[in-house]
Amino acid sequence: MALSKEELIEAIENMTVLELSELVKALEERFGVSATAVAAAPAAAGAAGAEAAAAEEEKTEFDVILQDAGAKKIQVIKEVRAATGLGLKEAKALVDEAPNPVKEGLPKEEAEALKAKLEEAGATVELK
């Protein structure tokens, strides 16, 4: 059963950023093409294109930075271990030496979820 153009557009409108990214990758692989912009007018689009690409990257990938462990340091260490898979010694060192990145390059949803877990455990967390 084929989708009409309107149904396809509607389906794309309802996708998350992560789902759209996966769709683009799948289309690139299936058709052997690249979704990078064609440099038809490099002088006009050079700086603006680079700034737009940087802004888009900032919006899709976040670093979770532990600023302070707070009073419940043991709970924060447990959450760091659960999120990163680090051993007890490594997780304790990461928490003791704050500010430190807990995880980097996360999609917005995952970064916000991790931030919420760490803050619930008593930590002060920043997304960059």
From Swiss-Prot:
GO terms for molecular function: mRNA binding; structural constituent of ribosome. It comes from the Bacteria. SUPFAM superfamilies: ClpS-like, Ribosomal protein L7/12, oligomerisation (N-terminal) domain. One of its GO terms (cellular component) is cytosolic large ribosomal subunit. GO terms for biological process: translation. InterPro entries: Ribosomal_bL12, Ribosomal_bL12_C, Ribosomal_bL12_C/ClpS-like, Ribosomal_bL12_oligo, Ribosomal_bL12_oligo_N_sf. Pfam families: Ribosomal_L12 (PF00542), Ribosomal_L12_N (PF16320). Disulfide bonds: none annotated. Gene3D superfamilies: 3.30.1390.10, Single helix bin. Keywords: Ribonucleoprotein, Ribosomal protein. Homodimer. Part of the ribosomal stalk of the 50S ribosomal subunit. Forms a multimeric L10(L12)X complex, where L10 forms an elongated spine to which 2 to 4 L12 dimers bind in a sequential fashion. Binds GTP-bound translation factors. Forms part of the ribosomal stalk which helps the ribosome interact with GTP-bound translation factors. Is thus essential for accurate translation. NCBIfam families: L12. Belongs to the bacterial ribosomal protein bL12 family. This is Large ribosomal subunit protein bL12. The gene is rplL.
